[in-house]
Amino acid sequence: QYARLLGAEGDYSGARAQFAILLELEPNNPDMISTAALLDFELELYDAALAKFLQLIALEARLDEAFYYVGRIQAADDRYSEAIEAFGSVGPSREFRDAKVRAAQVLIDTAFASDIRQFFDAQRRTYPSSAEQLFLLEAESLRDWSGESLEAYDRGLAAFPQSFSLLYGRAMIHESEGSLWAMEQDLRRILAQDPNHAATLNALGYSLTNRTQRYEEAAVLIERALALSPGDPAIMDSLGWVYYKLGQYVQSESLLREAHAALPDPEVAAHLGEVLWAQGREVEAKDVWQEGLNRVSDHPIILEAIDRLGVALP
């Protein structure tokens, strides 16, 4: 108990010393080995941590945790094939998702998109009950290669045609590629199953606002989303933005100020600044934009707005 208390209070070195004593008494106790290994990992004593996690594997105890940390240590040591094998050995558990994401990242850094598919194909054969999640992780890991990512979403949806997460993810890829019709079709497939899916209502409404002039339709969608998720700053931002497009500046400013107070995100700042600018309140607009750029100096939405409006910031 004393050793665990030291660890809980952040005294990892003291806790490690206490667990070393305890392990001399019970050298094959999985709980003690696990805690001692995690302490070593926190203290960046990776060789010692690796030895303990490998001991857990030999004891066939806490396997998912052990394989996960073995993979992390080996990846940091540039032992990529061993890291991928370790991450691949993590079964459904709290470490499952992050292990597969880390394996994909190793493959992205060292191999090709085809290797990522092979890895996830093998994972789906090994863990068929997690196949839907694995399709999603594969597609997300390939997002910088939109063609390969779309292909992974397509394969996933062929197996799980009603999957909200796969439909939503594919819709966002379509949106980023400018394929508005395809994006809208996927989002409406979700809404056909669940008309009250607030995130999808908001995503569709916001995309229609930015990509079309269907502002009234967009406003109806986003208003429904906000009614379902009152106080959500992202949805308030979307609604404020479509109200701006409709020329309803007072309502727009009120929503955007509330959203900005709750979520001081540069994209919200871009929208609020533009609404203020449209009302002739140029100093206030510049202050809001500058605040956003202080957070993210090269934020594309703010930079696009001030360039389009011909604004010079101090």
Language model features: what each stretch is:
Residues 8, 42-43, 76-77, 109-110, ...:
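Register position in tetratricopeptide repeats
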Residues 21-22, 55-56, 89-90, 122-123, ...:
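Canonical positions in the second alpha-helix
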Residues 1, 35, 69, 102-103, ...:
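Canonical tetratricopeptide repeat
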Residues 32, 66, 99-100, 132-134, ...:
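TPR alpha-solenoid repeat register
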Residues 4, 29, 38, 63, 72, 96, 105, 130-131, ...:
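Residue-level recognition of tetratricopeptide repeat
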Residues 25, 59, 90-94, 125-127, ...:
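Structural marker of alpha-solenoid helical repeat scaffolds
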